[in-house]
Amino acid sequence: MEDYALTFGINPFIALMIQPIVTMTVVDNQGLGLPVDIQHKAKPSPKASQMLPPDLGPPSFQNLLSPSEKLEPWDPGMRKLTVQTCGLTFIHPAGHGLCHPTAEASAETLSSTALNRPSVREGACNEKSTENKKPQDSVLWSHSRWFQGN
């Protein structure tokens, strides 16, 4: 209320005195003698997760605890990665390199067609392009070493 009073040039003390009178008049059922309009009852809109197909919806505890649907037979171009720390399983295309330090430090369980592929080693992303070589962050490097040790 004080902000409006300063905007319109009214002394804040006077505005504070007027505020309870205005509030009582507006809140009172017959204060201004105006008819009370019944507002339309708004229906709650569905959440975005309810509108998505089940396979695109957010993960739920039920999906995490129940055995997930298995993709059989494995596509030769896919790899199954299992992260030891949280027990999640990710399917990753074999054509894309694993360039994130935590991803390359995770334990890999490969499908039968991908058992003989070379594993991703540290710095493999930087070896591909020499022109955009950036120094590796020491914090990420230390975390990748920690993940490899566990």
From Swiss-Prot:
Region (Disordered) residue spans: 118-137
Gene Ontology terms, MF aspect: vitamin transmembrane transporter activity
GO cellular component, one term: membrane
Top-rank taxon: Eukaryota
Biased composition (Basic and acidic residues): 124-136
Disulfide bonds: none
Leader peptide range in chain numbering: none
Cited Pfam families: Folate_carrier
Family: Belongs to the reduced folate carrier (RFC) transporter (TC 2.A.48) family.
Protein name: Putative solute carrier family 19 member 4
